[in-house]
Structures are given as structure tokens and as C-alpha cells.
Amino acid sequence: MCPALSTDLKQEVLTDPYESFMHHHLQYYGYFRGLEPREQFKLPVQRCRKVVTDSDSDMPSSQEDQKKLVYSLLLDSPVFKSRQLVFEDQEGKIIPRLREPKDLYGSSSQDGCWQQARWPSECEVIKQDISHIEWDPTDREIFYKPTGNEPKPPVVSEGTGAVVYEISPAHKGSYFKGSRTGGRKCSHRKNQKVQCNNDLQFESRFESGNLQKAMKVGMYEYELTLRTDLYTSKHTQWFYFQVKNTRKGVPYRFTITNLMKTNSLYNEGLKPLLYSQQDAALKGIGWRREGKDIKYYKNTRSLDGRSLYSLTWTFEFPHDDDICYFAHCYPYTYSDLQRDLKSKISDPACSHYCKLRTLCRSLAGNSIYLLTITSPSTNLTTGAKKKAIVVTARVHPGETNGSWMMKGFLDFILSDSPDAQLLRDTFIFKVVPMLNPDGVIVGNYRCSLSGRDLNRNYKSMLKDAFPCIWHTRSMVKRLLTEREVILYCDFHGHSRKNNVFMYGCNSKGHPLTKLHERIFPLMLSKNAPDKFLFKGCKFKVQKSKEGTGRIDMWKQGIQNSYTMEATFGGSTLGNRKDTHFTTQDLKSMGHHFCDTLLDYCDPDSSKFKLCLSELQRLVEEDIREKMKQLGRDMDSDFTLSDITLSDLESSTSGSNSSESDGLPAHLVDIAEKFYQKKKRRLRSRKERNSLYQKRNARQKQKLHEAVEVSEPAAHIVRNELTKSSGKRKKEQKVAKIKFQEDLVPQTEENLTTAAPTEKSSMLYSRKPESVSMKTQMINSLPTSCVRDFMDLDHVCERQMTIRPRPSANGNRLPLIITVVQQSTLPPVPKGISALKQHPPPFHSILDQSGDQLTVADHVFRRDKSVAKRGFSSAGIRPYCSGISGEKQKVLDGSIVPLDLHLSLSPEVHRQNKPRQEPLITLGSTEYFEGFLPKPKTDPVRRFPGISSSEPHFPNSSEDITVRNTMK
């Protein structure tokens, strides 16, 4: 009907432009509710706005203007500026309340839009949504029985086969630089052409896919190369790829050629997984175990010095032109997690006791979700008494069985069963279902986009490199300050052992709590006897695993800290022996985990005590078995406290994650610029003990030679001269030394051996120090040149500064101590060391103009005794001031002269008691130039063939005592 022909037209309501503007403004920003028309327009509607003229500008404001002023004042208040408050009209009163949190994925829950996964910028991704149905096979899937005749196809050389599929490698040496939603668009590759209609078509550029290269080496044979973890050159275990253009009834052979683990469950009956889209659509069949002639073996290739291994199997596709998938384990992607979380929080009953929020963002920007599950508390006191339980999973992206156990755990704890309700009323659950979403998305097996294993970096302080680990640890640390955390468990997968088992930490606290950490795994083994193997549990704390979540949480104070490991294979227990695990089996372990929590925290402690007594019996049996293997017997009074339980267990190793421990990939190049020094290999204990024994043997040999050899100075000089280059020069010096030895013979009786207390002084030098010819001649100084010492009044009258000897390469230099004994002097008493003073006193006594020594007669007088007075040396205290009067008289009247000890060491040996013999200390070599008298008994001798720059001294018939030591 045309509006122009209408006779009963409604009167048009013309609102004030200002009111209309304010109405739309408030409605846009959420401050205007618009419940009823009368509430929307509080101001009266005017047909036209009154024009204010100059004549009526002085009139009082109208009622409308006053209300507008009130609106403007209210809008400026902080309450209205907040976006977290919403005002509601309840019974005529305006009540503010908090705004509901935003939807999980930043959109309304009605439109069904989800946040897409973010990929590294360089990763190509196909635009295809891949999903699989869940299916539990009616019959149990039996292990493959190896016959021993399985073929081992050799790896063909490069360029031999036809490449039918290839993507870019894992970017070894690079690092993560950025991400984008949905990844990069796929580009056409020339080398991915199908040679004929019978060739299979491969694809892995989808979420969690992993296949780098496929090469056709036979009519129906293909060699496959897996992509290593992104930004690394390691960890090839997980595979998941698509195959198209299949032919029914044709035996195809697939061989993966770059696996890195030395052993695998494929040699114990594990089969690969197959998924057929036609079977899923027509028969409702999902993932199932298939394959024949399965063999895991070592091939001829290597990578970075490590051998590579191959996995081969044959298979017949069930349909023609089918789309099939092969996988190492049941895939569970990041999108699968989002779908499961979406379905749970959309349930109104579930959302009442389950709150979901984002813990943090990963390196690529993907959300790491945190679920808080507990029943609402009626009062604050009840809520404060609740204890906490922390459960995490999927820190290793290739261990998808951990996600399936997590799915079973969430299905049970969020259900409406009475046991689940009791758990929610008793505990607060903090759940992180996927710790490493980036690795899951790109198809890694063990690492994140940092190129490192997250389960080795719980102690790291690099928040930006390991955000999920850092925030998870901070969350637990904050939770511990608020309430007690009775259990922490991280769900994992294991590739070398069957069944399900746990790794824990031995308690080192009070003896009453011993073995308590083993009670929960024992209870779990009783709840799942056909899947969980308690004997497979280990509780050893290894230093190489200190960065794991299990040990880090244990050190923070959580006694029951575990990792629950589920095999990639199946069970070897009970009626499930030699059968594969299905997704339903893995989810059932999550149910059993919750049942065990109820048993462990039951107020009735009868189960707890029964398990503890059984544990004591099992441990005693293990001890007896261990003692029997060692050939020892146990005493009757033997207790568990007499041994360390860790000694009974083997290592929990089975993974090579330590190879991916260290700095993130983007910091490795930076660190190498600052630290170029080559890392030294750490020696084992056996190597260290061997080196220690050899070093001690060499030191003992040197000490023995220093004590037994009668001429140490000549021996050292001989060794030093033999090292010089030139045969003639070497022979001349050896002849010269031999000639000198003939002229200056030494008797065995005139040599003083080294004291046992001086043994350590010879071990400071790494190499034997050489002694010059000049020093050797000084050591051979005859006693007749010294004569009798009667008085030295003017020697060392002033205090002089002692200059320390310079060290040689950080080693203490050998010091020469010469003890000159007259024939009429008594021997030195034992326990009294010679006076040690620096610098050496004999450097200036040599007369360079001739070969004969001269000694000043005016220095030594026969009318005074040396012991009549004490005298000071340069920089040290007097030595004779403490001698008693009787002893002094004996010394003065003694007709037997005393010994004279001359020492060259800069260190002064101080004793509690004063010296008992008079000593003379020479403070400076300047006082000895021309002081010593000429010898009366020794004739003048000259050494032919010896230059004057190295003076030699004649032999004497008097007693000579020469002592060379190293201090």
C-alpha cells in the first residue's frame, strides 16, 4: 500500500536532536539499557527546539537544561566510565553489577566462531578441516607376532627414486620469528607430480601432521622421511599423514627411514594406526591397528654422527580412491581440545562449577587454557579449607595418549555422578589440558617452537622463551601460598615400555612418611589391574631430570608429585595381555585416577594402612633380591632406614630430551658470539680416579729421586741441558758437567737428606726447575773460605725491606738452602730449622776478576763469641734475646763452636719457643763484597776449558754439607 494514499497517518514524533544524539551515544557505549519507552526518554518530546535569542538569554534555565546538566555530570563520574559495571533496574532501584566475562573465543556463543590456530609464518597449511570420529572396536586388537623373517628393505641413495611429495625441512639453525592465523597459503611444487595414475598422493600440511618427503622406490613401495621438530635436527618419532588415490587389494610397503631411537615397541608387537574415511562414513569405523611384516631396524644412514633406524610395514587399503590416514598414536589436535572445551562450558550445569580462562599465550599466540573445577562454597571458611590438586598434560606434543587420559579425567570430574560431586566438594582442581599447543599444531614430537623440551625447563627464568611453563609454575607457587596441594600429576606417553605406570620422588623427610609417596600408585594399580603396572613405577630423583615438572613441584613442597606414563602400545597384564590400548582404555585411566583420589583421601584410613604394610613387604622383598644378587646376607635387625631406596631402582631414562636442553634456539647464536670457548668434556669418575693415581705416582717418583740422588743440582742441570737443540752443543755441556763432577766429588756422609715434613714443598712445581751453573758452584763452597766468625757488629744495623721473590707461572720457585758446617761444630739438633732470609747472601762473594775467593779479615775476629749478644736481622725479630742466662754461659764457655745456618727462603719460620742456638742473618749482599778472608788451607786451582763468566771453586778436604731444597 502506498503511504501517500493513507488517510490515517500517525503523527510523526520529532525528537530533540540533542536528545537523539545522547540516546544513541549512551546506547552505543552500554550505559543506556532501553528497557521501556518511558525509561528511554525521560525528557519531554518537543516538536522543535526553542531558539534562544539575545533577549531571553538572561532567563533561568529550563527544566530540560537542568536534566541535561545532570546527565553530563553523571557521565564524568568514575562509576559510569567503568566498563565492568552494568546497572539494572530491580524493583524500581538501579542496582550495579559486574559484567559477564567475554566469550571464550572473543565472539558470541551463538555464531559458533572459534579462534583458529596460529602457525609459524613460514609453515604452509592446506585449507581443509580434518576431523575423525571416535570409535571403540568391539574386538580387542592383538599385538603383531614377529616371525623373524620380516624383510629389511635397504635405504636407496638420493636421486634413485621418484619424489612424489616434499615440503621444506625443519629450518635447522633458524628460530621462530613470527606467526599468523591459519599459516601460509600452499604453493604448487613441481616435484609433487603424480607420475602415473597408480601413484599414491601424500599430504601432511595440516594440524599435527608430520611428513617431509615421500619417494617412490618400487611399483608399490615408498620411502618416507619424517620432519624433525621445528628449529631442531632431532626427535623423529611421531608421524601423521594423509594418503589418497588408493587401490584396493594391492600390498603397499611403507618404510620410514630417519627414526632416531635405538629400540621401539614396534619390535614387540605394536602396529601402526589406520583411518579410512569411507569406513568411517559407511560403517562408523574409526582408528584401528593394521599392518603386516612390521620391523624396526638400524639402517645405513646417519645424522650428526648418530645412526638412524627404519620402520617398515605392508598394508592393503580397503577401498579404491579412498582418503586414508596413518598415525603413530591416536591424534588429538589443538582444535579437538577447543571443541571439547566448548561443549563443556556451554553446558549450564557444568559452567556452574567449572571456570575456564586463558593462563597465558604461547610463543605463536595460541591460548593455554586453565580450568578451575570445584563446587561453589557456602562460606569463606569452607572454601579456605579445601585442598588443591594440579593436573597437566601434553607438554610433549607427540604424546597424544596423555590428552586422551586428560579427556577421560575431565569427562569424569565434570559429570553429575556422586563420586565426581564429592571430589568437587572436597578439592579445588587446577587443570592445564595442553601445555604445548604450538608443538601440537606444527606436528612436533617433543619440543616447542623454542626448539627445546619444555619438560626440562621448569627451573628456567626465561619467561618469554617458555611462557607456558613459567606461568604454570607461578600459578602453582601462588596456589601453595593459599592452600595445601596434596597431589600434582602430569600425563605423558612412553615409547619403549608397555602398560601404564608412574614416576615419583622418594621422600627424604620424616621416617614416618617413608614410602607414603608410593601409596597412590599402588592404589591405582589395584583400581586398574589390567592396565597399570606398579612394578614399572620408579621413584628415583636424578640430577639430569631436575628440570622436569615432577621434580620441580616436589622441591616446592608437593610430596605426591608424579608423571603418569601411558604406553603407545598396550597391556601385558591379566585378561588384556598382548592387546593394544584404545582411546576408551586411555580415557578409562582418567576415570581410575579420580577413583584413586577418593580412596587416597578417604577419612577411613584402613586402605591407606593396608597399602603401606604391603609396600613395606614389597620393598623388603626387593632388598632381599638385591642382596642375593650381590651375594650378601641380611641381618635379623635389618630395617628400611639402613638403605637408600633409590639404590634399588634403575634409571627413569628412556627419553633423549637432555639433548634438547639448553638455551632457546633464538638465543643460541647470540650466546655463541659472547662465548667462543670450546666446551670441555666432563670426565667420568673412572677417568678422574685414573688421572689422580697417575699424578700421585709421578709426584712420589719425583720425591724419591730428590731424596735419594746425591747431586740434585747437577742432575737437574743435566736434564735441562739435554733438552737443548743441537747435538754438538748438547755433548759439550754434558762433557763440561761430567768434568766438574770429577773435580768436585761428594761423599755420602757429607750430604744432608730432606726432612719428611718438606715433602709437600716439592709438589708445587709442575716441572722441575733448572739450577744455573753459578748457583751450583755456590752450593759447593768449601768451609775453609768462611773461617771462624767472632763478631759482626756492623752487619744488618738497619731494618731493610724484604722483597718477595717473583713467582714463575703461578708456581712456587725452588729455593736453595745451604748449610755450612765446620769440622769443630756440633750437629744441629732435630726439630730446629735454619733461619730463612731473603735475598741470597752469596751473590757478591764471587771475585769476577779471578778464580779465588777473597774474604775480608776485619769482619771476623777471634776475641769475641757469636753468642754473647743478640742481633736483629732485616725485617725480623732477634733470635738470641730469649736464651736463658745459664744457657748463655754454657754457650760462651763452650770450646765447641756452633753451627752456622744460612737460608735463602723469604719466609720466616716462627716457633712458640725462641731459637736455642745463635744464628747469623745476612740482610743485604752489599755487606759481603770483599768481606771474607782468603782461605789458608785450600790451594788455588783453575779449571781448564771453563769461561770466567761461570767461576768454579776448588775442592776441600774439610767437611761440606750442602742441602738443596724446594720450598
Curated annotation (Swiss-Prot):
Catalytic activity: (L-glutamyl)(n+1)-gamma-L-glutamyl-L-glutamyl-[protein] + H2O = (L-glutamyl)(n)-gamma-L-glutamyl-L-glutamyl-[protein] + L-glutamate
Positions contributing to Zn(2+) binding: H396, E399, H492
Catalytic residues of the enzyme: E565 (proton donor/acceptor)
Sequence ranges assigned to domain Peptidase M14 in this UniProt record: 330-601
PROSITE patterns: PEPTIDASE_M14
Keywords from the named record: Carboxypeptidase, Cell projection, Cytoplasm, Cytoskeleton, Hydrolase, Metal-binding, Metalloprotease, Protease, Zinc
InterPro entries listed in its UniProt record: Cytosolic_carboxypeptidase (IPR050821), Pepdidase_M14_N (IPR040626), Peptidase_M14 (IPR000834)
Localization: Cytoplasm, Cytosol; Cytoplasm, Cytoskeleton, Microtubule organizing center, Centrosome, Centriole; Cytoplasm, Cytoskeleton, Cilium basal body
UniProt xrefs under SUPFAM superfamilies: Zn-dependent exopeptidases
GO MF annotations, alphabetized: metallocarboxypeptidase activity; zinc ion binding
Cofactor: Zn(2+)
Keyword Cytoplasm recorded: yes
Segments for region (Disordered): 679-706, 944-967
Primary subcellular site in the record, as a coarse category: cytoplasm
One biological process term in Gene Ontology: protein side chain deglutamylation
Matching SMART domains: Zn_pept
GO CC, one annotated term: cytosol
EC number: 3.4.17.-
Comp. bias regions, Polar residues: 946-967
Entry similarity comment: Belongs to the peptidase M14 family.
General function of this protein: Metallocarboxypeptidase that mediates deglutamylation of target proteins. Catalyzes the deglutamylation of polyglutamate side chains generated by post-translational polyglutamylation in proteins such as tubulins. Also removes gene-encoded polyglutamates from the carboxy-terminus of target proteins such as MYLK. Does not show detyrosinase or deglycylase activities from the carboxy-terminus of tubulin.
Protein name: Cytosolic carboxypeptidase 2
Upper taxonomic lineage: Eukaryota, Metazoa, Chordata, Craniata, Vertebrata
